[in-house]
Amino acid sequence: MGTANLHDSTNKPLYGERIIEESNIICFENPNKKRIYEISIELPEFTCKCPFSGYPDFAKLNIYYQPNMKVYELKSLKLYINKFRDLKISHEEVVNRIMDDLLKAAVPHWIHLNADFNPRGNVSMKLDIYSGQKRN
Protein backbone atom coordinates (compact mmCIF):
# COMPACT_ATOMS: atom_id res chain seq x y z
CA MET A 1 0.00 0.00 0.00
CA GLY A 2 1.41 3.36 -1.01
CA THR A 3 1.59 6.49 1.10
CA ALA A 4 0.73 10.01 0.07
CA ASN A 5 3.64 12.30 -0.70
CA LEU A 6 2.71 15.49 1.14
CA HIS A 7 5.59 17.37 -0.48
CA ASP A 8 4.59 16.59 -4.08
CA SER A 9 4.38 20.00 -5.75
CA THR A 10 2.92 18.80 -9.06
CA ASN A 11 -0.36 20.28 -10.14
CA LYS A 12 -1.80 16.85 -10.85
CA PRO A 13 -5.37 16.67 -9.48
CA LEU A 14 -5.92 14.34 -6.56
CA TYR A 15 -8.33 11.44 -6.98
CA GLY A 16 -11.14 13.20 -5.08
CA GLU A 17 -10.73 16.32 -7.21
CA ARG A 18 -10.89 14.22 -10.39
CA ILE A 19 -14.06 12.46 -9.22
CA ILE A 20 -15.73 15.78 -8.37
CA GLU A 21 -14.71 17.36 -11.69
CA GLU A 22 -16.08 14.41 -13.69
CA SER A 23 -19.32 14.12 -11.72
CA ASN A 24 -22.82 14.67 -13.07
CA ILE A 25 -26.23 14.34 -11.47
CA ILE A 26 -27.30 10.72 -11.85
CA CYS A 27 -30.89 9.61 -11.50
CA PHE A 28 -32.59 6.26 -11.21
CA GLU A 29 -36.09 5.12 -12.05
CA ASN A 30 -38.80 6.20 -9.65
CA PRO A 31 -39.77 2.98 -7.84
CA ASN A 32 -43.42 4.06 -7.51
CA LYS A 33 -44.57 6.30 -10.35
CA LYS A 34 -48.23 5.92 -9.41
CA ARG A 35 -47.84 7.47 -5.96
CA ILE A 36 -47.43 11.18 -5.32
CA TYR A 37 -44.77 11.69 -2.67
CA GLU A 38 -42.25 14.33 -1.66
CA ILE A 39 -38.52 13.87 -1.11
CA SER A 40 -36.37 16.31 0.85
CA ILE A 41 -32.58 16.47 0.57
CA GLU A 42 -30.34 18.62 2.76
CA LEU A 43 -26.84 19.64 1.65
CA PRO A 44 -25.46 21.56 4.66
CA GLU A 45 -21.91 22.20 3.41
CA PHE A 46 -22.34 24.03 0.10
CA THR A 47 -19.54 26.45 -0.79
CA CYS A 48 -18.69 28.75 -3.67
CA LYS A 49 -16.68 31.97 -3.90
CA CYS A 50 -17.83 35.56 -4.10
CA PRO A 51 -17.16 36.82 -7.66
CA PHE A 52 -16.15 40.24 -6.33
CA SER A 53 -13.94 39.47 -3.32
CA GLY A 54 -12.98 35.84 -3.83
CA TYR A 55 -14.00 35.11 -0.23
CA PRO A 56 -15.79 31.82 0.35
CA ASP A 57 -19.56 31.78 0.69
CA PHE A 58 -21.21 29.00 2.69
CA ALA A 59 -24.81 27.85 2.46
CA LYS A 60 -27.19 25.09 3.38
CA LEU A 61 -29.13 23.86 0.36
CA ASN A 62 -32.49 22.16 0.73
CA ILE A 63 -34.15 20.39 -2.17
CA TYR A 64 -37.79 19.41 -1.89
CA TYR A 65 -39.37 17.64 -4.84
CA GLN A 66 -42.09 15.36 -6.08
CA PRO A 67 -40.49 12.90 -8.49
CA ASN A 68 -41.92 12.07 -11.87
CA MET A 69 -40.11 9.28 -13.75
CA LYS A 70 -36.72 9.70 -12.05
CA VAL A 71 -35.24 10.15 -8.56
CA TYR A 72 -31.91 11.85 -7.78
CA GLU A 73 -29.06 9.58 -6.69
CA LEU A 74 -27.60 11.15 -3.54
CA LYS A 75 -23.86 10.48 -3.92
CA SER A 76 -23.80 11.93 -7.44
CA LEU A 77 -25.73 14.96 -6.17
CA LYS A 78 -23.18 15.48 -3.39
CA LEU A 79 -20.27 15.29 -5.84
CA TYR A 80 -22.02 17.61 -8.31
CA ILE A 81 -22.61 20.21 -5.56
CA ASN A 82 -18.90 20.06 -4.63
CA LYS A 83 -18.02 21.30 -8.15
CA PHE A 84 -18.95 24.83 -7.08
CA ARG A 85 -16.45 24.98 -4.21
CA ASP A 86 -13.81 27.04 -6.02
CA LEU A 87 -16.08 28.73 -8.55
CA LYS A 88 -16.46 32.52 -8.38
CA ILE A 89 -20.20 32.97 -8.86
CA SER A 90 -23.01 35.06 -7.38
CA HIS A 91 -25.61 33.53 -5.07
CA GLU A 92 -28.35 34.20 -7.60
CA GLU A 93 -26.47 32.68 -10.51
CA VAL A 94 -25.33 29.54 -8.70
CA VAL A 95 -28.76 28.72 -7.30
CA ASN A 96 -30.37 29.20 -10.72
CA ARG A 97 -27.69 27.04 -12.37
CA ILE A 98 -28.24 24.26 -9.83
CA MET A 99 -32.00 24.44 -10.40
CA ASP A 100 -31.52 24.24 -14.18
CA ASP A 101 -29.34 21.14 -13.78
CA LEU A 102 -31.79 19.50 -11.36
CA LEU A 103 -34.66 20.10 -13.79
CA LYS A 104 -32.67 18.79 -16.74
CA ALA A 105 -31.60 15.62 -14.91
CA ALA A 106 -34.92 14.43 -13.50
CA VAL A 107 -37.86 16.58 -14.74
CA PRO A 108 -39.78 16.32 -11.43
CA HIS A 109 -43.48 17.16 -11.16
CA TRP A 110 -42.58 19.90 -8.68
CA ILE A 111 -39.34 21.12 -7.12
CA HIS A 112 -38.31 23.77 -4.59
CA LEU A 113 -34.65 24.69 -4.10
CA ASN A 114 -33.86 26.71 -0.98
CA ALA A 115 -30.41 28.21 -0.40
CA ASP A 116 -29.68 29.68 3.02
CA PHE A 117 -26.34 31.51 2.84
CA ASN A 118 -24.39 32.14 6.03
CA PRO A 119 -24.08 35.77 7.15
CA ARG A 120 -21.02 37.64 5.95
CA GLY A 121 -20.42 41.26 6.91
CA ASN A 122 -23.66 41.29 8.91
CA VAL A 123 -25.71 40.33 5.84
CA SER A 124 -27.37 36.99 5.17
CA MET A 125 -29.33 35.86 2.16
CA LYS A 126 -31.93 33.21 1.37
CA LEU A 127 -33.04 32.23 -2.10
CA ASP A 128 -36.04 30.12 -3.02
CA ILE A 129 -36.77 28.85 -6.52
CA TYR A 130 -39.80 26.79 -7.50
CA SER A 131 -40.72 24.92 -10.64
CA GLY A 132 -43.76 22.90 -11.60
CA GLN A 133 -47.09 22.38 -9.89
CA LYS A 134 -47.18 20.72 -6.47
CA ARG A 135 -49.57 17.80 -6.37
CA ASN A 136 -51.69 16.64 -3.44
UniProtKB/Swiss-Prot annotation:
Catalytic activity: 7-aminomethyl-7-carbaguanine + 2 NADP(+) = 7-cyano-7-deazaguanine + 2 NADPH + 3 H(+)
Record-level Gene Ontology MF annotations: preQ1 synthase activity
Alphabetical keyword list: Cytoplasm, NADP, Oxidoreductase, Queuosine biosynthesis
Binding site for substrate: 72-74, 91-92
E.C. numbers: 1.7.1.13
Coiled-coil regions listed in the entry: none
Subcellular location, record wording: Cytoplasm
GO cellular component term, pick one: cytoplasm
Keyword Acetylation: no
Pfam families per record: QueF
SUPFAM superfamilies: Tetrahydrobiopterin biosynthesis enzymes-like (SSF55620)
Pathways per UniProt: tRNA modification; tRNA-queuosine biosynthesis
Active-site residues, Swiss-Prot/TrEMBL: 50, 57
Enzyme superclass (EC): oxidoreductase
Protein purpose: Catalyzes the NADPH-dependent reduction of 7-cyano-7-deazaguanine (preQ0) to 7-aminomethyl-7-deazaguanine (preQ1).
Protein name: NADPH-dependent 7-cyano-7-deazaguanine reductase
